[in-house]
Structures are given as C-alpha cells and as structure tokens.
Amino acid sequence: MRSYKAKMVEPITLPSRERREEVLAEAGYNAFNIPAENVYVDLLTDSGTGTMSDAQWAALFRGDESYAGSESFHRLREAVEDVTGFSRVIPTHQGRGAENVLYGCLVEEGDVVLNNAHFDTTRAHIANQGGDPVDCPVEGARDPVRDAPFKGNFSADRARDVVDDVGAERVPVVVLTITNNSTAGQPVSAANVRETAAFAEEIDATFVIDACRFAENAHFVRRREEGYEDRTVADIAREQLSHADAIVMSGKKEALVNIGGFVAVRDADLFERAKQRAILYEGFPTYGGMSGRDIEAMAVGLREAVEPPYVEDRVEQVEELGRMLEERGVPIYRPVGGHAVYVDAGELLSHLPSEQFPGQALVCELYREGGVRGVELGSFAFPGADRLELVRLAIPRRTYGREHLEHVADAAAAVGERAPEVTGLEVVSEPPTPELRHFSAELAPV
Ligand code: F0G
C-alpha cells in the first residue's frame, strides 16, 4: 500500500505516434535530446526527479539565505548527524560537487582508487585528479540471472590483487557505493561494509561511502541479512555509515530533493582542507553550492528517507515494475535493484550485435511505443567496455503510480513481440569527449 497521496499534480500527455516518430528523429535517436514535454513516463533517472513532501515544501520558507553561518546550515548539519552520525558536513550543489571536493583532497596523480563499481561521475573525478579508478565487483555481479542477495558487494580479493600489483602506498582511497548503481542497483551487505572498512584500514586508505542510495541499501540489509530483520532502516543505515571515514552524498536521490548534496568527514584536518576546496568550487562552507531554502528541504528529506513507510514503499514499487516486466516475458537483470529495473536488451534484441547498440535501440523503441524514456547503459554509454547491454528504467521517488508502471511494462512487452523487426543504430555525430558521448551524440537507424 502506498504511504502517501498527491497534493499537487503535473499534467503529462502522450504525444501521437506520428509525433513520437518525429521527436525521435529530431533527437538523433538519443533520449537525452528529447524535450521532456514529449515524454509520457520519464524513467531516465531517479536523480532529482522525485516528489517532495508537504513538510519539505513548508521547510523551504524557513530558508536562511545568509552568506555565512546560515541557520539552515545548522539544521542540515543536525539532520546529517542524526541520520548518518557525521558531524563535519559541507553542503554541495549535488553529488559530483561532493566528489570534486573530497577526491580533490585525497587523490593525486598516479594514485589508484578502488570501488565496488565507480559511477560515471566518480570515475571522471578520480581520472580528473590523475588517478586510476579500478572496479572490484564480486563474482557474478555481471551475471543478469544469478540470484544472490548482495551482488553489489566489494571484492576484497580482487582489491588485494590490485594492491599486490601497484603497492598499498599508491591506493589512498577505497570507495563503497551503496547501493551499487553501476551494478544494476544491487545492494551491499552490512558484513561487506565491515570487511571493506577493514581492508581499507589494512592498507591505510581513507574509506569513503557513496551514500546517495543509503536507505534503499539499509532496507535490503533488513530484508536479506541475518540478524538485521528486527532492526530499523534508520539504525542499519547509521551502522553502515559508522564504518566510513567520509561520505559523499547526492541529495537528489535519498535526501529526496531536486538539487543538492553534501560531503561529510570524520577527520578534523581533512575537514579543513575540504572546506578550502569547497570555497573554491562550491561556495562558503555553510551554504556550499545551495540556497538556504534548498538546504532546508534537504534536511527534512534526509530524515524522511529513513522513516519506515517511505523506503519500504519505494523499493517495493521498483520490484513491482520488475514483476510486471517478467510477467510479460521481458528479460531483466535479477534480482531487481533498489532504484531501477535494468532490462537486458542484449537478450531481448539478441539479433543486434553490440556495434548496433541493442540497448539504445530498445530505448528508442520504448519511446516510440509508449512515450517512455529510459537510459542505455551498454556499448553506447561505455564504448570499448565489455558490459551487459542494459537499459535502466529508474523510478523517481513518490512520483508515479501503478498505472504508469503498467503502461511501461505494456510498452516493453509490445517491443518484445516485434523484437526481430527492431533495427540497430549507428553513431552519426559525437562530441570530442568519448566518455560523455551518450549525453549528446546523434544516431541513425542502420
Ligand atoms: N554517485 C552515484 C552512485 C550516482 O548514482 C550519482 C548520480 C552520483 C554519484 C552523482 O550525483 O548527479 O547529484 O552529481 N547518479 C544519477 C543517475 C545522475 O542517473 O544515476 P549527482
């Protein structure tokens, strides 16, 4: 049962089939180029696209816009301390701002950073510092059908191999991304958090948790890990974060806001250095990259994220979409993750070779069929990488209802029925930076 109802609505329309065809061609068969007014159900991302609560909207009016020493900052600091246990906090404009501040202090030319799996912006910030981001997924993480409770875990064995190779002194940072966005939103167990923290300590590295989906992760721990079934999500979340030396947070996910983020650290010296860098790139450390009113909304949202009805509801809605797709014979990555269902386009459109971007072809077909927007995470987004051809259907928080999800599942099923007729795509123009090509490149049917 949903634990909220709508108090404000936003009209959406499904453009006609002819119009959708035109829009696709005008967008160069790239969903990022589609104007949002032409999208019916938008599952491009769960980042900043959710619905705020009435309490969050009310909090906006309390925003203290003082340049220094804002009251709003103090309320955020308190919320962060209550929810995460960290008292040294710097607000940033979003998650990648937090990454820039933190990794700019910790990573130098020639360093290696280990992560269960780097999210794109994390990878880019490490690389921007001259570092080498290395993923350490567990066995089976890239197997879309293997059923295991914590496929998002960090492999300390793999990490030890890397350290044996390069030397511990070259690995200043170990990151754990919970849940693991680059591995189909899979959770990380509490045991793995402890194990990763111990590994980081062993090599004298700073242990960072990318906490943007921390409540969803805590929910999975409660559901799947022995000994946690009677604990609250809030309690589990705090326990998980208690092992970290620092956290980076995109508030656009589980602080339930449209914009914002923060970095929080334990060490007083690192805090001072991070504040200096924040002044350079974000703003004075009591507002960072945010307005006072947005900080207020984030302080309220962060507390809401660990309240019992919210996260249960949230993860179950994602599971529900997974179930609907499976009932209609659409292949998905199993088990379903916390924020999104990842459709296995390589399986659904198995006649298309990876050079013809089966994932991107599916993204286009979902739009053509139902005005649904998802995002490709395969050969188009990650050129040259050996990856599954996935399409992520990320669900904005507290935003869509069952009818919308049924519409999405029906659209995917309709594409599945005519799968052999779906044509592949080729890139016709792309920006100079290959890592960013999926955001703006244009394609055409082969
Ligand atoms: N870390 C993770 C694990 C993320 O998923 C994201 C963003 C970031 C950091 C960066 O945060 O966008 O606030 O700067 N993920 C979004 C997504 C964009 O669609 O998955 P940001």
For the regions a language model picked out, list residue spans one by one.
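Conserved PLP-enzyme active-site core in the AAT-like
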Residues: R2-Y29, N33, D42-G50, Q56, ...
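C-terminal, active-site-flanking charged/polar segments
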Residues: S16, A361-L366, A413-V415
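A short, surface-exposed helix-loop junction/capping segment
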Residues: D54-F61, A345
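Short, conserved charged micro-motifs
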Residues: T179, E272, S350-P358, R398-H407
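Conserved phosphate/anionic-ligand binding catalytic regions in large, soluble enzymes, centered on
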Residues: K252-A255, V341, Y400
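Short beta-strand-to-loop capping motifs
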Residues: V265, V343-G346, I395-R397
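Conserved small-domain helix->loop->beta segment predominantly found in fold-type I
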Residues: T286-Q360, R368-L390, T423-P432
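PLP-dependent enzyme catalytic core of the Aspartate aminotransferase-like
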Residues: A305, E369, A381-V446
